[in-house]
A protein has these predicted regions:
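A generic structural signal for well-ordered alpha-helical segments
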Residues: 60, 132, 196, 232, ...
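N-terminal Rossmann-like NAD(P)+-binding subdomain of aldehyde/semialdehyde dehydrogenases
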Residues: 1-31
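Rossmann-like NAD(P) dinucleotide-binding subdomain of oxidoreductase/dehydrogenase enzymes
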Residues: 19-159, 297
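Residue-level signal for inorganic ion chemistry
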Residues: 3, 64, 95, 116, ...
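ALDH superfamily catalytic-core signature
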Residues: 90, 123-277, 300-301, 340
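Short glycine-enriched loop/turn motifs at secondary-structure junctions
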Residues: 109-110, 143-145, 175-177, 210, ...
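Conserved C-terminal structural/oligomerization subdomain of aldehyde/semialdehyde dehydrogenase
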Residues: 150, 256-360
Length: 360
C-alpha cells in the first residue's frame, strides 16, 4: 500500500543529500535539505473518495506538512466518516476536514495554502487554478479528458475487448483514465462488437441489481449521460446497448434502456456508440460512464489526427503487436501515461509517475 511504502522509504527520502562543490568554491561544502511546505489543501473527488483523498494526504503529511481536506459533497457519508476517523487521530491543526458544497470548495481553493492539490474535471480545475493564483499558491492538478484507445489491425480482438471492457466498466466508467473512445480498423466492427459483448457478459452476467456493477453517482450525472446518447442518436449515431441478462448477445437499438427502472437505480447498461463524429457532445466531453464511442479508421494518420485534434489526454491505450507502428503513434501524440495491450496501468503501477499534460 502507499502508506506502507511511504513509511518504509521516508527516512531515505528525507535524508540530506550532499552535492558536488566546484573547485573554486572549496573548502565549502553543499547539501540539499528538504523541509515542509506548510499547509497543504486537498480537494478530492467523488469517484474514488477514499483513495483520492488519503493518497495526497499521506504524501503531504509524510513530508511534514499539515493538511486541510475538502472531500466531495456528492459522497456525504464517506466524507462524514473521513472527518470522524481523522478527528480521532489528529488534532484539527494537524489534519482538518472541511465539508460543504461547491460554494465551500470555491472559497476553499482561494485560501492562502502553501500548496493546493485538486483532482476533478478540467473545467473545475481551471477555476481552482485561477483562485489559487490570486494567492500565488502552487497547484497540483489531476484532471482528466478523453483518453483514446487504439486497436491496431493485428490486435487480438478477444483479448483487447476483455481488457477494454474491464477498463471502461470499472466503477461504471467513472474513472479518470477509463478508455473514453475507441479507434478501430475499418472492417473489424462486427468482430469487435461481438467480442466486446462476450467480454462484458463474462465480467457482468447482469447489470440491474448487480452489486458488482456500479451505479452512476447521482441522477444528475445519469441524466447527463442519457442526454449525450440521445443527442448522438439525433445526429446520426447508432447506439448498441448490451442487453441485461442476454449473455453475449449484442442488443439492437430497440432494446435501449427504458430510462425508468434503470434510472431509478442509476445502473446504466454498457453501450457501443457507432458512427460518431467530432461535432457530437459525446466526442467533445469526457464521458465518465459506460458508453464507448467507436471511430472506424483506414490509416494510422487518421488516428493521429483524431487524437491531436483534441485536448491532450490523461492516458492513451494501444492494442497491437507491431512495435514500429506503436512507437510511431507514441512519437506523434502527447498524453499522460501510456499502456500497451491493457488498460488502467498508469494508476495501478505504484512505481510509475502519474499525471497528464495540458488540459489533463
Amino acid at each position: 500500500t502507499m502508506l506502507t511504502h511511504t513509511l518504509r522509504h521516508l527516512a531515505r527520502w528525507m535524508k540530506p543529500r550532499r552535492v558536488w562543490t566546484p573547485l573554486h568554491l572549496l573548502p565549502a561544502s553543499a547539501r540539499i535539505e528538504r523541509q515542509p511546505l506548510g499547509v497543504v489543501g486537498i480537494i478530492s473527488p467523488w469517484n474514488y473518495p477514499l483513495q483520492l483523498a488519503l493518497g495526497p494526504a499521506i504524501a503531504a503529511m509524510a513530508a511534514g506538512n499539515r493538511v486541510m481536506l475538502k472531500p466531495s459533497e456528492l459522497t456525504p457519508h464517506t466524507s462524514a466518516q473521513l472527518a470522524h476517523v481523522i478527528g480521532q487521530f489528529f488534532a484539527p491543526d494537524e489534519f482538518a476536514v472541511v465539508q460543504g458544497d461547491a460554494q465551500v470548495a470555491s472559497q476553499f481553493s482561494g485560501l492562502p495554502f502553501d500548496h493546493l492539490v485538486f483532482t476533478g474535471s478540467t473545467a473545475v480545475g481551471r477555476k481552482v487554478a485561477i483562485a489559487a493564483a490570486q494567492q500565488l499558491t502552487p497547484t497540483t492538478l489531476e484532471l482528466g479528458g478523453k483518453s483514446p484507445c487504439i486497436v491496431a489491425s493485428d490486435a487480438d480482438l478477444e483479448q483487447a475487448a476483455l481488457r477494454i471492457a474491464h477498463g471502461k466498466l470499472l466503477n461504471a466508467g467513472q474513472t479518470c483514465i477509463a478508455p473514453d473512445y475507441l479507434l478501430l480498423p475499418k472492417g473489424q466492427e462486427q468482430a469487435f462488437g461481438d467480442a466486446y459483448a462476450k467480454a462484458v457478459a463474462q465480467l457482468f452476467p447482469s447489470f440491474m441489481g448487480n452489486p458488482d456493477y456500479a451505479a452512476i453517482i447521482n441522477h444528475k450525472h445519469y441524466a447527463r449521460l442519457r442526454v449525450l446518447v440521445q443527442q448522438a442518436e439525433a445526429q446520426g449515431a447508432y447506439v448498441q446497448w448490451l442487453d441485461d441478462g442476454q449473455g453475449a448477445q449484442l442488443a439492437s437499438a430497440a432494446t435501449a434502456p427504458s430510462w425508468g427502472k434503470e434510472a431509478a437505480q442509476r445502473q446504466m447498461p454498457p453501450a457501443l456508440v457507432w458512427n460518431v463524429h467530432s461535432g457530437m457532445d459525446i466526442m467533445r466531453e469526457e464521458i465518465f460512464g459506460p458508453l464507448l464511442p467507436v471511430i472506424s479508421y483506414e490509416h494510422l494518420d487518421d488516428v493521429i489526427h483524431a487524437i491531436n485534434a483534441g485536448e491532450r489526454p490523461l492516458a492513451l491505450y494501444w492494442f497491437g503487436n507491431d512495435e514500429k507502428l506503436r512507437d510511431s503513434v507514441l512519437r506523434r501524440t502527447v498524453s499522460g501515461g501510456v499502456t500497451v495491450n491493457d488498460t488502467l496501468m498508469p494508476v495501478a503501477h505504484a512505481f510509475l509517475p502519474f499525471g497528464g499534460v495540458g488540459g489533463s
